[in-house]
Regions:
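Extreme N-terminal starter segment of soluble prokaryotic enzymes
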Residues: 1-2
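Glycine-rich beta-strand-centered segment in the early N-terminal region that forms part
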Residues: 20-34, 48-98, 136-139
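Well-ordered beta-strand positions in beta-sheet-rich domains
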Residues: 14-16, 122
Length: 161
């Protein structure tokens, strides 16, 4: 599959990499739309700690897609469902996570930030993202492009509330 990967400051490449394998508790998502964020630009221009030629990172944390494959232990979600995601996955046990504020977790992981993101044909959705409710089903009247910007729109909305 094709993926846009960061290899360091000002070093971003479109490369062919294997489609991610999933386990029985994960989901494989086929990317339909992904938005470019200021964070992606900053990482491209400045690089990211831990990302280099030996440890590249697939960018993209604002995205939507269709479920391609579902692990046998995953409840509710089915192949063909259209979803978008909240990109931050908290540890699930700290006070912030218990309060539902995963984005404030000191040990959070995030698609396209410190784990492979959606500037690729496919994205692996790990079990903790499935369990913690990071996926949201897209209604039929919302396009993938519109769904991909739900996350940045929610950031703006939360800034006003």
């Amino acid at each position: 599959m094709l993926a846009l990967r960061l290899y360091g400051a000002n070093d971003i490449r479109l490369v062919d990499i294997p489609v991610p394998e999933i386990n029985d508790d994960e989901i494989l998502l086929k990317t339909q739309a992904a938005a470019l964020c200021g964070t992606d630009i900053r990482m491209w221009k400045n690089g990211k700690d831990g990302v280099d030629a030996d440890h590249p990172l697939t960018l993209g944390h604002e995205f939507a897609g269709v479920i391609e494959k579902v692990g046998k232990n995953v409840p509710f979600y089915q192949k063909g469902m259209r979803v978008t995601l909240q990109p931050n996955i908290g540890c699930g046990i700290c006070d912030r996570c218990v309060d539902g504020k995963y984005h404030l977790c000191d040990d959070y992981r995030a698609f396209g930030i410190n784990m492979d993101g959606a500037f690729a044909e496919y994205v692996k959705i790990p079990a903790d993202a499935v369990i913690r409710g990071n996926l949201a089903v897209i209604p039929d009247n919302i396009s993938p492009a519109e769904a991909a910007v739900v996350e940045p729109m929610s950031c703006a909305y939360n800034g006003f509330t």
